[in-house]
């Protein structure tokens, strides 16, 4: 998401997005961050949030806020110096480490094994446990929008990013074994958005034209589904997201319409692989490994579904500067949830029959909202001393997957 400076709008939201499993909405603003639970958005009339003012740390105007699932570990990119990545533990109120780069950070993705940092022309990979750099992918095709995604399932860390500035190719890189996996042609135009499903065996893609959304199997790059939006005009696709069971895919754009596509198999349609692979026998081995975890619709790589219209749509009350959309599973029901940069979140119940979805919840979020803080952690003046004291009193457990210990180290 593009940032808006505080001079343009003192109360603006600079960043908004969902965490890896869509259980938390992350908001970055001029003074700090706010986290909202999606379950609270669906269940409560009044929202609470976890948040903190980070100005005492010099982190004014948070441009990127990413949280590791529902843990206390998060990363911050501040407008004070967008070339610096701050890894922060918000329970102990301690900066774990800083990593400085020679260009602005455009995108950050986390899973339980890796932190992946995307610059305009290179990608850095860090080990989450000790925050040490594992690898850097140099001289990547110019990626001014920071288009990149990382799988979130345990033990798997595939990175996807555009493979060309001229065509719509997608490159997959294994961030565990630190080696290239495959490259496949997804669109004629350049890639504008891409997103893995939660199992890491499918990826959705959209080009800068925005009229066609496709789904490919991972890692071999077979086209599984192709969806055409309901209008012919070009749009900017802001976000893509699979449901947790990979039965639905949703997209948002610079229009007021959110589209939901149903991932159903169609019998008797042949499809050819679109991947050019690297690694020979190694690729065959990893392909078999991934196949063991693929759902049935992914294994049927010969079956391609093409639809001219979305399965369901949701109308946003207005077109914001930007938005992010997700499919949230709550109490055996699927919901479409859209969070906008003008400080609103909208929830729609996904009807199994599709069609136009009804708005069931609407909340204000961000610094201008009337929400209350659930667990105040802001320190104000003297916050650094309190942070050190808090981290000494309660050291997080290294073996707890939802917690990681504060460590001190800075990379140049």
From Swiss-Prot:
Q: Name a biological process GO annotation.
A: cellular response to toxic substance
Keywords attached to this entry: Autophagy, Cytoplasm, Cytoplasmic vesicle, Lipid-binding, Membrane, Repeat, WD repeat
- Where the record places motif L/FRRG motif is 227-230
Q: Where in the cell is it found?
A: Cytoplasmic vesicle, Phagosome membrane; Cytoplasm
Keyword field contains Repeat: yes
Membrane topology per the entry is: Peripheral membrane protein
Where are the annotated segments for Disordered?
363-412
The text the record gives for the protein's domains is: The L/FRRG motif is required for recruitment to phosphatidylinositols including phosphatidylinositol 3-phosphate (PtdIns(3)P), phosphatidylinositol 4-phosphate (PtdIns(4)P), phosphatidylinositol 5-phosphate (PtdIns(5)P), and phosphatidylinositol 3,5-bisphosphate (PtdIns(3,5)P2).
What name does this protein carry? Autophagy-related protein 18
- Please give the organism: Caenorhabditis elegans
State the organism's lineage: Eukaryota, Metazoa, Ecdysozoa, Nematoda, Chromadorea
Name the encoding gene, please: atg-18
